[in-house]
């Protein structure tokens, strides 16, 4: 447990009545500065908190260690989730660690093979349900009631408890100086909810002198929360057919939208809806600086640039962007298409090929 960046903050987590937490050494991930990406985005400073450095490659591990520990405390034997990939990988690993069985419901044809491979490797039962995350989640709720499954999606409050430690780490790594803005991608909005919970608790403890603004960036084709926030309406209108290649945020009915809205109200927050081209450009920019991430993560940085260009973020802003998933989570995205192709000319010699590449041909 001492190797866990989450359980270092055990005094701020629920009491597990003597149950040994289920941990894989999650947390404690790096937060490098990204000066070239900051210049590209138009802000004075940009650091990236890379939660893809967690054991299964995403931020989900921060919450899953707590949720699976609670399942053990309750004596549950089977855990389940609906997932576009990252939740399933994390749940399967932590369930395996705890000796529990796990069931994953996924939308048909909508999940990265790399993410499915993780869940399969860890021994989960994979079931297809519908064509969107929201279809799979609705089916999960029915099956959970019928079969007594312990659900570990972000509607589970224990997930939020673990994920709030991300903001604790961010502030700790900054010597408890709050940034002007924390940017993150928005899918089911559990992460935004968790950040808000962490900020409220830190402020109540007197550890936070001011609230950073929270920016939630969604893909334009899956942006119901952005539309609600921008329109000022009281209720979220679901997107029945969400579309984006950033599969981790391809969600049309985010379960945590009410909590996320309260977070934006608390922090004078912002939202952005970024195009596929903007996501791809941000991902390339990060990669050129040696920082790899999955497409959904890049949406956070794309949102910073978009709002800076619109004048909604000042040039002098000090920004932390949360990268939620590892580069290897969605290698199909890289291989299939967002980069200019440079097919080798089989008739040219190696020197000519190299010279042409160096010239950017």
Give the ranges of each region predicted by the language model.
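PLP-dependent amino-acid enzyme catalytic core
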Residues: 1-361
